Amino acid sequence: MILKKKVAGLTENALRNFVLRARRAVGVRGQVNVLVTGSAAVRSLNRQFRRQNKPTDVLSFPFVSSLSDPRQSAKVAGDVAISADIARQNAFCLGHSALEEVKILALHGILHLAGFDHERDNGQMARKEARLRQLLGLPAGLIERAHPENRRSSKVRRATGARRTA
């Protein structure tokens, strides 16, 4: 875990513990490395690896081994890069903490490492993420807002910053 940009309440140890819980919940066995950094660094990664010259909230990089030993591939699942700046913006719009948003984005990235793709799976990833967020005690995120069928009305926090009424 590397925290290049601070997020209130987030420590490397807390992030490591959350990622372990999320990995287990998703069923990812290999190590997941997480970088929390600024928008400029994430934009650079997005440009370099996805040919998109814009910042984004989270990027996932599955580990692909060119080694003939499959045990090496099983040791590392991949890397996740999170923009602390965009996490703060998302959190403000959704009415929860930046700490919670970083966890939501880490979970989202881990789901991508497990092979899920919300751009092509007709909502399968969104439904899985919604279930896992509930299991891990996290609020609704942007992907849930993009797929209204996954919303639980009493738990959704509106973009106006309204608080949950649980």
Positions of the model-derived regions?
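An acidic/histidine-cluster motif and surrounding catalytic segment
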Residues: M1-V102, L111-A166
